[in-house]
């Protein structure tokens, strides 16, 4: 009789349904602590959560899955929502993520797709967050900033005026990390469109003249711009 009563109560009070994708996306972003940047959703399935992760214009989202049918479903969903480009998806092939080192602000792993943890951490930017789904919830791990990366906060490195950074990762360029607009300056033999670049706290700060490129005689439009130093 007790078993029957318990079963009756279970039927009368069903378990709560999983959170809808927009609510789940908001919860995951709050748990991550990331306020903007590049999100990669590993194991994106049909793209329902992938699309919801772009809660505002501060985020750009990319979904990855080995199942091409799921990628097609994700792309169809993104096109229907008119957000393709701001949110994208591609098929995962091989055992490496198709991303350069230190690029991603939030790596959301719903299904590891056979990718190991060192490879996941490789693509995270310093300060980036890895959220991994488990049977009991989501585990959070932060990639700490390496001690051998330095800031350049003044014209000559820092307030001391000594133009030597304490940075052992600086070296000749080996790959293109990211591209940021505008692609052309206003003129080739006048004042540079970009000047006074400094860095601090994982950000690049610079002054950019975004005035018309039709003629250098037109008024300038100087702007102070801040970008993520690792992915723009």
Predicted regions and their residues:
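Conserved class I S-adenosyl-L-methionine
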Residues: 34-51, 58-62
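Conserved SAM-binding loop
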Residues: 74-75
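Conserved SAM-binding strand-loop segment of SAM-dependent methyltransferases
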Residues: 82-94
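A short acidic, Gly/Pro-enriched loop at the edge of an enzyme's catalytic core
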Residues: 95-106
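A short glycine-rich, Lys/Arg-flanked "PGG" loop and its adjoining helix->strand segment in the class I
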Residues: 115-129
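Blade/loop signatures of beta-propeller domains
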Residues: 145, 150-181
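Residue-level signature of beta-propeller blades and closely related beta-rich strand-turn architectures
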Residues: 158, 203, 210-212
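Extracytoplasmic/lumenal domain signature
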Residues: 167-190, 213, 217-232
């Amino acid at each position: 009789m007790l078993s029957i009563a318990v079963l009756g109560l279970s039927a009368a009070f069903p378990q709560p349904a999983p959170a809808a994708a927009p609510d789940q996306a908001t919860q995951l972003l709050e748990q991550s602590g990331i306020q903007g940047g590049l999100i990669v959703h590993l194991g994106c399935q049909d793209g329902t959560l992938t699309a919801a992760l772009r809660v505002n214009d501060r985020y750009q989202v990319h979904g990855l899955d080995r199942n091409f049918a799921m990628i097609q479903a994700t792309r169809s969903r993104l096109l229907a929502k008119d957000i393709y480009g701001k949110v994208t998806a591609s098929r995962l092939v091989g055992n490496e993520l198709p991303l350069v080192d230190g690029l991603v602000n939030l790596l959301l792993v719903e299904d590891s797709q056979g990718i190991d943890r060192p490879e996941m951490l490789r693509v995270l930017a310093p300060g980036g967050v890895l959220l991994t789904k488990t049977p009991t919830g989501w585990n959070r791990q932060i990639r700490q900033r390496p001690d051998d990366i330095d800031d350049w906060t003044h014209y000559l490195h820092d307030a001391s005026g000594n133009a030597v950074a304490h940075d052992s990762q600086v070296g000749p360029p080996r790959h293109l990390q990211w591209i940021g607009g505008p692609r052309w300056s206003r003129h080739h033999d006048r004042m540079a469109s970009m000047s006074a670049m400094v860095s601090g706290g994982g950000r690049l700060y610079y002054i950019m003249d975004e005035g018309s490129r039709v003629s250098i005689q037109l008024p300038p439009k100087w702007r102070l711009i801040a970008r993520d130093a690792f992915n723009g």
